Amino acid sequence: MTDSIPHIPVLVKESLSLFRGRNPVVFCDVTVGAGGHAEAFLTEFPSIERYDGSDRDLSALALSENRLLPFKDRVRLRHASFEEVDTLTSDGTYDGVLADLGVSSMQLNNLERGFSFQGEDHPLDMRMDTSRGMTASEVLNSLREEEIGEIFRNYGEEPLWRSAAAAVVHFRKKKKILTVKDLKDATSGVFPSYRLRKKIHPLTLIFQALRIYVNQEGAQLKVLLDSAFRWLRPGGRLAVISFCSLDDRPVKWAFREAEARGLGKILTKKVIMPSYEETRMNPRSRSAKLRCFEKSFEDK
């Protein structure tokens, strides 16, 4: 399977509604991906003269470049992490910033990337940026049992983190964990029968934990939340879409702290979630949450 399988952007209408009446001129999309949100924003807002889109996934950027060809004079794409975007961005640059956190449908559907437990014979990679960093396989084969357990606990909130880590280390003594099937085999005796009967795959939390660790998503999110308020012009808005509590909680707390410091106000007192119609059409959208913060019009 290839990256040509389209990613369906979530909460598009709701994201657009947060910027209507603002006439943004300079916009930043730090997770441009395949360009779904970008296409919608550039179509909806002719006022946007410059749309800076960045992503760590080179294959996604290639798709985005093709998708956004009709807007090529208004788009600037960059291969960059949140940290690298920060080094390239001056304070007070943007009227709006959008972040769509987590893994995309396109990445999940490409079994060769190792994000999904469906591709049994494919390598456990899980890197969003395949040009650098450790793969999930390298993590599982090189870290100590205690370190692996901490990953499963802290980034996956897996209740059986100790047992899962012990099973991984026991398995790798006989055979390296190189593929999705290897990880399944390594943890086959960990989960009780009731976990196996659930609709949610028992390895879901472990896959989440490995993905977050491999891509340093927590550290990257901290950089974003420490920096994005500075990137905004007075009256600018930061919109963040998250898909799990590990991402949503820091966003919620950062917005509350920024409001308490007088940096602006939270526009989404009640978090925005997908409609029933959207979750029916795109089941992967069901856990999405959208929050938005508006920077004060006065310098603080």
Curated annotation (Swiss-Prot):
Belongs to the methyltransferase superfamily. RsmH family. GO terms for biological process: rRNA base methylation. Its EC number is 2.1.1.199. Its main location: cytoplasm. GO terms for cellular component: cytoplasm. NCBIfam families: 16S rRNA (cytosine(1402)-N(4))-methyltransferase RsmH (TIGR00006). Pfam families: Methyltransf_5. Keywords: Cytoplasm, Methyltransferase, rRNA processing, S-adenosyl-L-methionine, Transferase. This is Ribosomal RNA small subunit methyltransferase H. InterPro entries: RsmH, SAM-dep_MeTrfase_MraW_recog, SAM-dependent_MTases_sf. It comes from the Bacteria. Specifically methylates the N4 position of cytidine in position 1402 (C1402) of 16S rRNA. S-adenosyl-L-methionine binds at residues 35-37, 55, 82, 100, 107. It catalyses: cytidine(1402) in 16S rRNA + S-adenosyl-L-methionine = N(4)-methylcytidine(1402) in 16S rRNA + S-adenosyl-L-homocysteine + H(+). It is found in: Cytoplasm. The gene is rsmH. GO terms for molecular function: rRNA (cytosine-N4-)-methyltransferase activity.
